[in-house]
Amino acid sequence: MKQLVTGIMLFSLLGLFSCKGQNVNHISVDGFAAALTPETPVLDVRTAEEFEAGHLRGAENIDWFQPDFVDSVKAAFGKDRPLYVYCRSGRRSAAAAEKLAKEGYTVYNMQGGYLAWTEQGREVTRYEVERFTTPKGTPVEIVLIKHASLEIRFGGLSIQVDPVAELGKKTNYATEFPKADYILVTHEHFDHFDQAAIGALKKEETILVTNARCADMAGWGRALSNGDKARFAFDIEAVPAYNTTEGHLQFHPQGRDNGYVLTLDGLRIYIAGDTEDIPQMADLKDIDIAFLPCNQPYTMTVEQCVHAAQMIRPKVLIPYHFGDTDLSGLPAQLPGMDVRLRSLR
């Protein structure tokens, strides 16, 4: 009987892991899922189009067929932890795993890929997720929904920023996200203020933080003016957001709209809202993550975005609220800064 039990246990382990090569493990969906934590490095090697249609939460997308695949992986992932890789069926990721193993990575490739994962009914998302940790060790996830819409997950809380359902690809907030503990709205333009989305996210305890105009339009909420501060489960400060270019001043008049600085256990996040490179940005201190808009004529040019980033000096810059603006040259213009180009058109 003891030999039988030992054999069953060995067979089960082989079902989760079957090694191929020194640093490559081909792993079942169950084994892959069991290994995932919020800190697990996960690489999706499918095309950008496949990734946007649906992917594993927290995965980073680097196309196996792009010429600089290995260099891009090296820039995104260290070799100090195992890397979990998948594609549609497991074939591309198997090839990628072999290649990365030769570069010194320990790689786990999911057998059957995304198809096998979804056949089991496991969770997927259409949105990229950026992960951070506060100075006190609390994990923070920022879900990059689209355009100016974000979800910040911190300490079991859901903080929605400028939720909008119908812009671009429809977002079904009622089914894709939990009810929000906090909803932050920067101003009343349609691509930032959507009462239907707010209604889908609202629960009895939800706190809405916005400018005065949106509070009036919604009929509820905590209105903050530029310079106001509030303390909830996190600290928040409303900061100026406005246009400075002649001919654009009417889009976002000074004093009406908000940007926000959130402090989560010491981690400081700047959400700029719709603004140009205004002088008040030089007063922002110790920003860890900055979301800066970059599209004309309503917000900043690439040159203005560079200037704004140079004033703020965030550790991480994530441009957002951009349309057809070409941001490909932005990282080279900000040497030494972690610039992350994501799907936030």
Label the model's feature ranges:
Residues K2-V5, F17-P38, A48-P82, R91-E128:
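Rhodanese-like catalytic fold shared by cysteine-dependent sulfurtransferases
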Residues K20, R126-G155, Q333-G336, R345:
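Zn-dependent metallo-beta-lactamase
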Residues V45-E50, K146-A148, V209-M217, S225-N226, ...:
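Short, polar loop motifs at secondary-structure junctions
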Residues T47, T245-M311:
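Active-site-proximal loop/helix segments of hydrolase catalytic cores
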Residues E166-K169, H189-F193, A215-A218, D228-A230, ...:
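Active-site environment of divalent metal-dependent phosphoester hydrolases
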Residues G219-F232, Q254, V306, Q310-R345:
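Binuclear metal-ion centers of metallo-dependent hydrolases, dominated by the metallo-beta-lactamase
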